[in-house]
Amino acid sequence: MQDNKIQNRTNPFFVPYNTPHDTVPFERIRLEDYEPAFMEGIRRDDEATDKIVNDPAEPTFENTIARVDPEKGEHYYDLLSRVSNVFSCMMSAETCDEMEEIAQKMSPILTKHANDITLNKKLFERIKFVHDHPNRELTPEEKMLLDTSYDGFVRSGALLDEEGKEKLRELTEEASMLTLQFSQNLLKENKAFTLHITDEAQLDGLPETAKAAAAHTAKEQEKEGWIFTLDYPSYSPFMTYSTQRELRKQMYMARNTVCTHDNEQNNLEICKRLVNLRRELAQLLGFETYADYVLRHRMASNTEHVYKLLNDLIEAYKPTAEKEVKEVEALAKKLEGKDFEMKPWDFGFYSHKLQMEKYNLDAEMLRPYFQLDKVIDGVFGLANKLYGITFKENKEIPVYHPDVKAYEVFDKDGSYLAVFYADFFPRKGKQGGAWMTEFQGQWIDHKGKNIRPHVSVVMNFTKPTEEKPALLTLGEVETFLHEFGHSLHGMFANTRFESLSGTNVWWDFVELPSQFMENYAIEKDFLRTFAFHYQTGEPLPDELIERIIKSRNFMAAYGCLRQVSFGLLDMAYYTQKKEFTADIIPYEKEAWKKAMILPLLKETCMTVQFSHIMAGGYAAGYYSYKWAEVLDADAFSVFKKNGIFDQKTAQSFRDNVLSKGGTEHPMTLYKRFRGQEPTIDALLERNEIKVQHKG
């Protein structure tokens, strides 16, 4: 006990942060603080569970479902969520070997702890009692919490016998370890590869920004020349602009064969095992497949609806996608000779040439107009136009890396709304891609105080150099808007319970706020607010904006089918009814072939790096990106009709969708905003897809 008291005095997780808005004191947290904080959080959770279970009073919503301490009136389970939020955020954005060791050690302990709660027979009996005999009329939010609590326990094995519960523990603990190993393997493989160029002639075709970034990377590694990596800001321009076909092939093969090699980072067997573990888990709980288990709590509701969406999209988009690819192939043959055979590492290069030929437009032409600082102003300004909120950088708020900026966010009435962190650039120990996360969620405490969220957007944009500020592509502007949309969902949260707050919604609804915001990237009136040349200050010319709008559907059908192919692959794995024994690489090619137009190489593999469905929560859920696209096109059509900055429409979207989190069924929330259920029509119209109706 003495050790614990010492820890209580020194471990920053155990004492009030005493920082602006109770933000995380990153500079005070050391690696050795995490494990004791996790263990103390688990101890406090166990103590809280015992209090609920042994409460002599009849189970009620307050003493059992809301998990309120009857003596102190406080909510239970605060410490563990506090340390877990920080640790998981750091594992993605600022990890190191020591953190990965902590994760390996804590992962099975935390999984066991979660199972100890959900498989606690006495606790479930109390929850079931309240579920079957509510002690009073419940609000819709309380009813949702009661239903999700009860169903969460059932879905976690509460109705199983002891043998079944033990089996469930084994399955979840193994899956937890394997997802962690999958992610660590992928990070190591991606960071291990570099293309080191010392002959300047091999940079032919590359834009200055790509060359400068590669020179900067080489300098950081104390090497001569230029270094290209598999991080998207380095990889993408190389594949788009490099005239060196063999080097493009080298980059493509490196990126598309990661975690398939004969080394410790091979993910093939891990993926196979994860598919089987999830199938076993679902069948243990009475479902035929893992997809059936997952879709029970999705807007799609069942596999038939998912396949209908994916197949409808294939039918609508495939003819146009085939034409798009043939156009690229025709241009390649025109430039290289009729015997030229296009390979996967050529597609980005020649499709870019086609884009230039058709629209005289490419990402690099726009980059000078998208200086990151100005884009930030534009995005914040958009939020102000729509919702009246303002952002103010506060250097007193601690950050975990010098690249990170922290802002206070204020509502239209001037009241404090949230803390917003932005982490823009790639670095060692940071996962690729882009995401939104939270260091603190939103809820209303026992005294009625509205605890406001601390949200973070993490991206990997091209870094500034000595000569140039950070300049974005239009695609990166879209990425920023996407993650910012998620953050608005978090920042506008206004619910009583944290587990129903912000982005804690059904998985095929969570992408609506993010994809909705992407629509603004090609809106003329939005671009005019921030797109100025970083050197001359000249605004983005109208004729360039017109070309952006005209080219917005360039390769849209091909892009749609690519996403659909990922959805098909996901469903193929998670609709397995028997043990999955196939070889991953050929199985993958078969699973998505009806949505594939370009031929693939037999040795490449997506599955082993498909974090979304293997380690990221999108298992049997990848279709939700396309599902949300139907929603976002439908929702944005209201803004197009009423005005893209219309505050009344924006307020309705905030009140009925963004602030409500998961407190009601998502379709109920959507219809309250839209007045009707969504249709696919707005998406087809946006992409200029004409469907031939049969009959």
Which residue ranges define each predicted feature?
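C-terminal, non-catalytic "cap/extension" segments appended to globular domains
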Residues: 4-36, 40, 225-227, 374, ...
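Secondary-structure edge/capping motif, primarily at the C-terminal ends of alpha-helices
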Residues: 48-59, 83-94, 157-160, 258, ...
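Short, hydrophobic/amphipathic alpha-helical patches that form generic packing surfaces
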Residues: 77-89, 147, 151, 253, ...
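Short pre-active-site segment immediately N-terminal to the catalytic Zn-binding motif
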Residues: 462-481
